[in-house]
């Protein structure tokens, strides 16, 4: 298992945030900037509006994304961690490409559960110029993602599609002639609404901002039900994704998913073995105190993956 305890070397968010640069890019951030107990500029990460404006400033300053917003009560993602997943996935593609990350529109990625924030397609396109298809079961989330894509003139790079069957993840989503180098997925973490609420309250307490009058804490602990939990939790979702991926074994080079709970790995590895995959990779990722990992699998052996890369190069 490869160890990646800190941010990926290519991650743009190394070290402390440069608040003067962020405020210059998005002046509205100034009214949310505070001084933390260490005397450094920061924001109140328990304030959802502050987090939203902070993300907007980060995307403007670091990625040139001029327009970004999400509806209230939708997941507001921590961008450095989301960027790490993109870079770790890029390393996966480089593995069969002589160590070089493939870039450009010839590389196509599928973001399963793109969400209202559309964050993975934005980061993946900005860093590597990949083309994306983002799927979701939530029409409100897709409408928000579409507004972001259109406002930034990215319609040729990022397409969106609704998964009309809420019981399926991949099933019925892709056309027979579509090919994807990569799939991405940040699955629902919890197994029930109650578990999601308890998890949010723990994070709220850790921030020292517990408020008994609130029904649910805010911040990037917010989110719609389908963003936070599903029946059976993370292990059931990822295991279902593994099972459904078999149907698209020829059409996708690498399937990947984040897995937050290390205790879920044995069950997921059993599902991968049952599916008969040809290759598996597990890469540990860490941002601050949060640990996660990317699980990747392919139904193509090494020579088949190299042949896929050669075909892609010939189309450039």
From Swiss-Prot:
Annotated SUPFAM superfamilies: S-adenosyl-L-methionine-dependent methyltransferases
UniProt KW keywords: Cytoplasm, Methyltransferase, rRNA processing, S-adenosyl-L-methionine, Transferase
Subcellular location: Cytoplasm
EC number assigned by the record: 2.1.1.181
Disulfide pairings: none
GO cellular component entries: cytoplasm
Reactions catalysed: adenosine(1618) in 23S rRNA + S-adenosyl-L-methionine = N(6)-methyladenosine(1618) in 23S rRNA + S-adenosyl-L-homocysteine + H(+)
Enzyme class: transferase
One GO-annotated biological process of the protein: rRNA base methylation
InterPro entries: METTL16/RlmF (IPR010286), rRNA_lsu_MeTfrase_F (IPR016909), SAM-dependent_MTases_sf (IPR029063)
A single MF term (Gene Ontology): 23S rRNA (adenine(1618)-N(6))-methyltransferase activity
CDD domains reported for this sequence: AdoMet_MTases
HAMAP family: 23SrRNA_methyltr_F
Chain's role: Specifically methylates the adenine in position 1618 of 23S rRNA.
Family (UniProt): Belongs to the methyltransferase superfamily. METTL16/RlmF family.
Name of protein: Ribosomal RNA large subunit methyltransferase F
Native organism: Pseudomonas putida (strain W619)
């Amino acid at each position: 298992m490869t160890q990646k305890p800190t941010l990926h070397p290519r991650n743009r968010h190394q070290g402390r945030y440069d608040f003067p640069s962020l405020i210059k890019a998005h002046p509205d951030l100034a009214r949310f900037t505070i001084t933390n107990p260490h005397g450094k500029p920061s924001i109140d990460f328990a304030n959802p509006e502050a987090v939203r404006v902070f993300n907007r400033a980060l995307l403007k300053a670091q990625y040139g994304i001029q327009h970004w917003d999400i509806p209230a009560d939708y997941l507001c993602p921590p961008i450095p961690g989301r960027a790490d997943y993109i870079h770790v996935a890029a390393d996966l593609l480089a593995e069969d490409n002589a160590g070089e990350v493939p870039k450009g529109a010839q590389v196509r990625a599928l973001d399963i559960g793109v969400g209202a924030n559309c964050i993975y397609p934005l980061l993946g396109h900005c860093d590597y110029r990949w083309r994306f298809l983002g799927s979701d079961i939530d029409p409100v989330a897709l409408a928000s993602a579409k507004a972001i894509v259109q406002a930034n003139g990215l319609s040729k790079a990022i397409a969106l599609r609704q998964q009309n069957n809420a019981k399926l993840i991949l099933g019925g989503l892709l056309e027979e002639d579509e090919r994807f180098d990569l799939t991405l997925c940040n699955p629902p973490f919890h197994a029930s609404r109650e578990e999601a609420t308890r998890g949010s309250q723990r994070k709220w307490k850790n921030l020292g901002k517990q408020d008994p009058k609130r029904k649910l804490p805010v911040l990037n602990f917010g989110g719609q039900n389908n963003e936070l939990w599903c029946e059976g939790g993370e292990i059931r979702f990822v295991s279902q994704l593994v099972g459904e991926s078999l149907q698209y074994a020829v059409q996708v080079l690498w399937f990947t998913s984040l897995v937050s709970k290390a205790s879920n790995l044995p069950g997921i590895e059993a599902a991968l073995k049952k599916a008969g995959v040809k290759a598996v990779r597990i890469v540990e990722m860490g941002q601050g105190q949060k640990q996660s990992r990317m699980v990747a699998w392919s139904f193509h052996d090494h020579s088949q993956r190299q042949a896929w890369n050669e075909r892609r190069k010939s189309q450039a």
